[in-house]
């Protein structure tokens, strides 16, 4: 009996140990899965971060402005974008590094300057004015950083070359060029453009002939903008047109490191045939206005004369005063003229038959019977 009880207890103990071992294995497997899941989540986070950084690197760093869409000069957004673009490229310039041979040359030149220090320092320092900036090229490579100045700057005489850029306001006259208006008139326009160098590094590294580039750009921009305006608008709205041209130019020249301050239309030259036709039209309009004014004056004068005649007809004393005033004016204007005044009553008598003849209307009277010439004579019985 004891042996049977011991065997049964051993069996139950073995079963319990097996079940506990199985539970331990399951818990370890679950922990392992959790541990595996955690690195997977970390890997996903890392991959997401990498994709985000890649997208940030792939994102464009520059804003592109289409000049053809700049039509309304009152848009302030275009000017703001142009200002931002003009400040960005100077920081974004990345000059290429020097090679091994170039570094050896730089070190040797520095050693030579140090050895001959008291005398060489005068050849390595230059002065830049307040309105100037200096760009240094070392062995053909643009040195990193902003333009030097104002004040002193150091350079290597044998390896460096420097270029000075004037930041003061520049003036450029645009010669006469043909423009076709909206109403198909051909005219010649000249203008003047005021600009300044804003980014010296970008200017020297991107543009060769500043004046020619700005001149051609102003001409093409004016042709494009004035094609949407009539002749009358061009002659009357020069200020708004100049503002439109300035905004359009500034959106392009910001990439070159140039800031356009102002543009003005100086003169508009019309062809001879168009000038003659416009002069004839203007003269006809002036003649029409003169005729209208003369007709209105005659109408007002006739109305005033009619009113004066009505007033004088009601007051005989006023007629006499007018008669005396006329005599006095005749004597003063022409002293050699002798005037014999007649009494006013005689004038009334002389004028009354004429007034009656003019005022009376002779109506046709009824026909009277014709009497024979010899009424006493009788006709013969034969007749």
From Swiss-Prot:
Keywords: Lipoprotein, Membrane, Palmitate, Transmembrane, Transmembrane helix. The keyword Membrane applies. Coiled coil: none annotated. The keyword Calcium does not apply. Residues 374-383 have a biased composition (Basic and acidic residues). The chain crosses the membrane at residues 103-123. Residues 124-383 are extracellular. Residues 1-102 are cytoplasmic. SMART domains: PHB (SM00244). It comes from the Eukaryota. Plays a role in the regulation of glomerular permeability, acting probably as a linker between the plasma membrane and the cytoskeleton. This is Podocin.
């Amino acid at each position: 009996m004891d042996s049977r009880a011991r065997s049964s207890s051993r069996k139950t103990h073995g079963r319990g140990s097996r079940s506990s071992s199985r539970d331990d294995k399951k818990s370890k497997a679950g922990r392992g899965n959790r541990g595996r899941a955690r690195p997977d989540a970390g890997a996903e986070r890392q991959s997401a971060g990498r994709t985000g950084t890649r997208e940030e690197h792939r994102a464009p760093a520059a804003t592109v402005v289409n000049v053809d869409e700049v039509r309304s000069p009152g848009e302030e957004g275009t000017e703001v974008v142009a200002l931002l673009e003009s400040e960005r490229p100077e920081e974004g310039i990345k000059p290429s590094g020097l090679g091994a041979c170039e570094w050896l040359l730089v070190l040797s030149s520095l050693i030579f300057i140090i050895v001959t220090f008291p005398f060489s320092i005068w050849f390595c320092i230059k002065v830049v004015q307040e309105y100037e900036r200096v760009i240094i090229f070392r062995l053909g490579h643009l040195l990193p950083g902003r333009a030097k100045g104002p004040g002193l700057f150091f350079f290597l005489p044998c390896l460096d070359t420097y270029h000075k850029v004037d930041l003061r306001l520049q003036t450029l006259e645009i010669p006469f060029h043909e423009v076709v208006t909206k109403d198909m008139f051909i005219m010649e326009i000249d203008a003047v453009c005021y600009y300044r160098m804003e980014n010296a590094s970008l200017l020297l590294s991107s543009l060769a002939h500043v004046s020619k580039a700005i001149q051609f750009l102003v001409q093409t921009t004016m042709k494009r903008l004035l094609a949407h305006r009539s002749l009358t608008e061009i002659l009357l709205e020069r200020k708004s047109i100049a503002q439109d041209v300035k905004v359009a130019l500034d959106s392009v020249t910001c990439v070159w490191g140039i800031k356009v301050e102002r543009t003005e239309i100086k003169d508009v030259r019309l062809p001879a045939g168009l000038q003659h036709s416009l002069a004839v039209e203007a003269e006809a309009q002036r003649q029409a206005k003169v005729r209208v004014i003369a007709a209105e004056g005659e109408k007002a004068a006739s109305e005033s004369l009619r009113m004066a005649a009505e007033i004088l007809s009601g007051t005989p004393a006023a007629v006499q005063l007018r008669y005396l005033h006329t005599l006095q004016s005749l004597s003063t204007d022409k002293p050699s003229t002798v005037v014999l005044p007649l009494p006013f009553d005689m004038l009334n008598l002389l004028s009354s038959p004429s007034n009656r003849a003019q005022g009376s209307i002779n109506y046709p009277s009824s026909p009277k019977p014709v009497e024979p010439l010899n009424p006493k004579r009788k006709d013969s019985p034969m007749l």
